[in-house]
């Protein structure tokens, strides 16, 4: 589909359906636990079975996460926002930023007002006015989005100074990735 080879994709999809080998799994989160790679939903799976590094900060997090995700390294590899935008609304309609934040797709100021927090001494001084609306928007999207992606102003379990640390993904200017930002 991404390459816009729709006829070829439709043929492949038809083969998957008519094979009767695959079906949607009841619990999305269970797909990512041991045994999930053998579920009826998995067509191609790479299972993370743990035991490498820390349970809260596997090697991929080390290379792609923030300092809080693993306790060191960098945070310059992120999922493309265009990919995140492909997650539909729960009702199956396409997601559109303009429905939530008019002017978002054309104005950097609107994007700034929507996402930018202000920090003081590595603490959030002021959240963006739109924080609650963002969280509401996430709730109304396909739940697989928030199960798969750390979204701005959501909480996640990180790893700092050899212990679990609960973190919030905050967007701000003039900071580095130390202490969760």
Task: Place the predicted regions along the sequence by residue.
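An aromatic- and glycine-enriched ligand-binding surface/loop that stacks and positions planar moieties
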Residues: 2-174
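Long, K/E/R/D-enriched contiguous segments that form extended
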Residues: 175-181
């Amino acid at each position: 589909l991404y390459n816009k080879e729709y006829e070829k994709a439709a043929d492949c999809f038809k083969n998957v359906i008519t094979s009767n080998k695959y079906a949607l799994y009841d619990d999305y989160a269970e797909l990512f636990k041991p045994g999930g790679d053998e579920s009826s939903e998995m067509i191609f799976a790479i299972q993370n079975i743990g035991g490498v590094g820390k349970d809260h900060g596997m090697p991929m997090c080390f290379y792609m996460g923030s300092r809080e995700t693993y306790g060191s390294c960098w945070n310059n590899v992120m999922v493309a926002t265009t990919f995140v935008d492909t997650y539909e609304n729960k009702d199956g309609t396409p997601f559109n930023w303009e429905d939530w934040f008019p002017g978002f797709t054309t104005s950097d100021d609107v994007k700034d007002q929507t996402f930018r927090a202000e920090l003081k001494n590595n603490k959030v001084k002021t959240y963006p006015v739109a924080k609650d609306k963002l969280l509401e928007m996430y709730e109304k999207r396909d739940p697989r989005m928030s199960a798969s992606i750390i979204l701005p102003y959501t909480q996640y379990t990180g790893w700092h100074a050899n212990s679990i640390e609960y973190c919030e993904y905050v967007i701000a200017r003039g900071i580095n990735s130390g202490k969760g930002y």
